[in-house]
Amino acid sequence: FLLTYYFMNRRYRNLLICLFTILLLGTYHATLYWLDRPRTSLVFYNVRGCPAVHCIESDGRSWINYVDTIPNEKRLKRMTANYWKHHHLLPPKEITGDCRYMVLNRQQQIISYHGCHICVINDNHWRNKTTVSPLYIQYLYLCKGYDGHLEELTRIFSFSYVILDASLSEYRRHLLESECKQSGLRFISLSDEGSVRFLL
């Protein structure tokens, strides 16, 4: 009788341990899925030669705004495939020019997404221009092609962050970093920090 009771009790204990382990694993995977779910956000990728702004919706839809008219999208897709899969993203809609959607608007390299404004600077279009009241944008995205200084852009824009793209030469990157520090501007260098995501 005692032997039977021992084995029955042991089987019951093992069953409880097994069920608890399954529950724990299920909770762990559910938590990981919840943490990795798509969230409304902006992503700037550390992909040299292909500057882009990725606008992501919480349902997995997204728009990837290429800065160059002939982008190296194959390189970007190859380097970001695991990230997109990890966060359960659908294939993004590719944008290379001005557009207008319900939540996304792009006009003359100024991208507006869920009330957040990003100005892409990849040429000298904004040099030597002034305005009575600077336009407020959250992110000033500096890419290869702009030869001026930050001071010129502060006459036109008021911004929270400067994003330095990986396409910038080392000389230009160090120069712009120095200007940011001197002006007390917050900046992120993608070459140093890697890709960054901002939740909206």
Q: Model-found features: residue ranges?
A:
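Transmembrane helix-bundle segments that form internal channels/tunnels in multi-pass membrane proteins
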Residues: 1-45, 52, 57-58
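Extracytosolic and intramembrane catalytic regions of membrane-associated proteins
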Residues: 54-200
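A structural signal for short secondary-structure junctions
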Residues: 35-37, 46-47, 134, 156
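Extracytoplasmic
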Residues: 39, 48, 104-106
